[in-house]
């Protein structure tokens, strides 16, 4: 049983709150007058895990980071630039990513395979290595919340807000911390997609266990958000575990295993929701919960299909309770359903029960749809499994942002 009481949100916590981590974010000239280079550094080689974009076109930094992690399953630094994706840049791009790793290793005095690199921004433009070389040489990470917040700014592209979260848990009677930071606003349809997330913890956990756990949690969190249905070339989630919390190694046999898993899931879920809420041009966060499914996978598939529907998203933007778009989207799913047993609730107001329309107050519904967080609940009445997905409305501003992205 998960000891929920032993997990507490740390207000104003950051990626440097767990023991052993420092960070920095700075402006080096990749973007106009904004921070665009950052680093997270650990005092000791940290167990790590990562998941990557499923886009068949994978950017050079992903290939280099995969190489680093595959060597020992440990990392001690992550270097990230924004403003340039270093994707679809050929062999030169791969060489530049390896050089970026080497520069970081030399600057921080680390083995090259202890350094991960990540890039985000415009695709198909060579990375300006003179700027990168000079920039990495200026990085001086600190164990201060201010520098952690600077890092969260340095990884942004079209995002309007930074995305950070932190939790404290109790394992073996000791305080253990876990925190995360993310970027992502457009081209979000993960499995991963234009999103980067970096998670730090002082938990004592080995690479293989952490990798399995992160992969499973990602399927329920980051892979269940969608902004515009596009997948990117650069995206990844990396977890670094310093092991400095003085607990026994955490694994599936540990008495507090579920506590750690729950805390990691909360961090991932918080960041996933923040990404959905900050979708390009978004004015509303949409959460879809599907109940009564035969399997969790079927529930998640339908939830994500609803939240990704352009017609549903535009209806929510227009504050229009057009539940017909929701039921139509459910019917388009590859999941076999019973068309006569579906319930739909919008903002806690029943609009469909056993697939029959329900009377409701248009005035009350209009008022509730003016809220910034919109909840759609669907019960299929086919089984006991559930699944959720998150997204945002689709506005005129989304078109404006993406039409003018390079300019």
UniProtKB/Swiss-Prot annotation:
Residues reported in the UniProt entry to bind substrate: 157, 183, 194, 280, 402, 407
Main localisation: cytoplasm
Keyword Cytoplasm found: yes
Catalysed transformations (reactions): N(2)-acetyl-L-ornithine + L-glutamate = N-acetyl-L-glutamate + L-ornithine; L-glutamate + acetyl-CoA = N-acetyl-L-glutamate + CoA + H(+)
EC number: 2.3.1.35, 2.3.1.1
Residues carrying the site annotation Involved in the stabilization of negative charge on the oxyanion by the formation of the oxyanion hole: 120-121
Pathway assignment: Amino-acid biosynthesis; L-arginine biosynthesis; L-ornithine and N-acetyl-L-glutamate from L-glutamate and N(2)-acetyl-L-ornithine (cyclic): step 1/1; Amino-acid biosynthesis; L-arginine biosynthesis; N(2)-acetyl-L-ornithine from L-glutamate: step 1/4
Localization of this protein: Cytoplasm
Entry's Gene Ontology BP terms: L-arginine biosynthetic process; ornithine biosynthetic process
Protein name according to UniProt: Arginine biosynthesis bifunctional protein ArgJ
Source organism (scientific name): Bacillus cereus (strain ATCC 10987 / NRS 248)
Gene name tied to this protein: argJ
